[in-house]
Amino acid sequence: MAIREIISIPDKRLRRVSEPVEKITSEVRALAEDMFETMYDAPGIGLAAIQVAVPLRLITMDLAKKEGESAPRVFINPEILSKSEDIAVYEEGCLSIPEYYEEVERPASVRVRFMDLEGEVHEEDAEGLFATCIQHEIDHLNGVLFIDYLSKLKRDRVMKKFTKAAKLAAK
């Protein structure tokens, strides 16, 4: 297991649409393990493979409620089957947009289909934080960031800040 580098905006790879996982191999399992280690180290509650520069449709998530508990989950080739008309607002953050948080409106619940590391296909209803997180991470797989839901003014301001920081870091 290894902690991988999390890429951040303005890195253009974050806008890439990820490819489906064709077969669950030892490499896919190792990637999931690395992603958990990276996510816990950050720390975060969800991570898409593209955030560690691997363009595969794989998500790791841990929404454990209490300190010291763990509820690791892997979602391979996840897809949203249906969305509620009800809207929920959560303050979202992203490991690829460090230390920036903003309220985002999303469907309050979704039905999602995904495969686990054993190759089993599941369908599950997601509500609350789980619904927000799975939508946020699936967006990553499609090259969409949570700042895309903000006004153009806010989005441009965030991109300008991170682009400037990236240029300064490169010097």
From Swiss-Prot:
One of its GO terms (biological process) is translation. Binds 1 Fe(2+) ion. Its cofactor is Fe(2+). CDD domains: Pep_deformylase. GO terms for molecular function: metal ion binding; peptide deformylase activity. Its EC number is 3.5.1.88. Gene3D superfamilies: Peptide deformylase. Fe cation binds at C94, H136, H140. The active site is at E137. Pfam families: Pep_deformylase. It catalyses: N-terminal N-formyl-L-methionyl-[peptide] + H2O = N-terminal L-methionyl-[peptide] + formate. Belongs to the polypeptide deformylase family. HAMAP family: Pep_deformylase. This is Peptide deformylase. It comes from Afipia carboxidovorans (strain ATCC 49405 / DSM 1227 / KCTC 32145 / OM5) (Oligotropha carboxidovorans).
